[in-house]
Amino acid sequence: MSDNLKSYQDNHIENEDEEIYERSNGKGKELVDFGKKREPLIHNHEVLNTMQSSVKTLLSSLGEDPDREGLLKTPLRMSKALLFFTQGYEQSVDEVIGEAIFNENHHEMVVVRDIDIFSLCEHHMVPFHGKCHIGYIPDQKVLGLSKLARVAEIFARRLQVQERLTRQIAQAIQAHLNPMGVAVVIEASHMCMVMRGVQKPGASTVTSSVCGIFEKDSRTRAEFFSLIKSNK
């Protein structure tokens, strides 16, 4: 198994505020936050008021009048939108998976592909969007199919970079299901490459994260890549 995808279950850290797993990557320790379900910040009036004030300051800094008709409700709308786009911080993988792990004595590959994902690049806070493909080989236990998409959604709804998002999805499935292997591929278009910078519409970024048998066995890995490309 590569340094980037060690087992995450060996060193479980108890923390009252959030579920955190510690893994060794060969260069020290990395904390992997699987989250804890919390009251949505969108219902926190203090947070909303602070964010609205900040948005008004941004609008004024752009030379706009935040009190003109078209912008009067923009601070509230933008604040609520940002909280929705980042609601993954308030969600827990444990809560999402719940009791949807089933003993099926199944050992063949399971693939859910073309999961739509939307996220915000943490560098410019502009969107990137695309498709996520998830595959795993169960060790008897299988996960409800919709839960794979929900796990991807938890990590996509945070400030992200695509490489980390791909890795976190794989880590969460590995840690909670303990399968024989996990593979995740994300294909995405980044607005920071379309609307600014190099301004190259049509460019896409592909990232992958594999562990277990997908890393050790090239034939298994090739089967996964073949399945996510079939009939396209």
Curated annotation (Swiss-Prot):
Pathways per UniProt: Cofactor biosynthesis; 7,8-dihydroneopterin triphosphate biosynthesis; 7,8-dihydroneopterin triphosphate from GTP: step 1/1
GO biological process: regulation of G protein-coupled receptor signaling pathway; response to Gram-negative bacterium; response to oxidative stress; tetrahydrobiopterin biosynthetic process; tetrahydrofolate biosynthetic process
Spans annotated as Disordered: 1-24
UniProt entry keywords in alphabetical sequence: Allosteric enzyme, GTP-binding, Hydrolase, Metal-binding, Nucleotide-binding, Tetrahydrobiopterin biosynthesis, Zinc
EC category: hydrolase
Family: Belongs to the GTP cyclohydrolase I family.
Subunit relationships: Toroid-shaped homodecamer, composed of two pentamers of five dimers.
Protein name in the entry: GTP cyclohydrolase 1
Gene name of the encoded protein: gchA
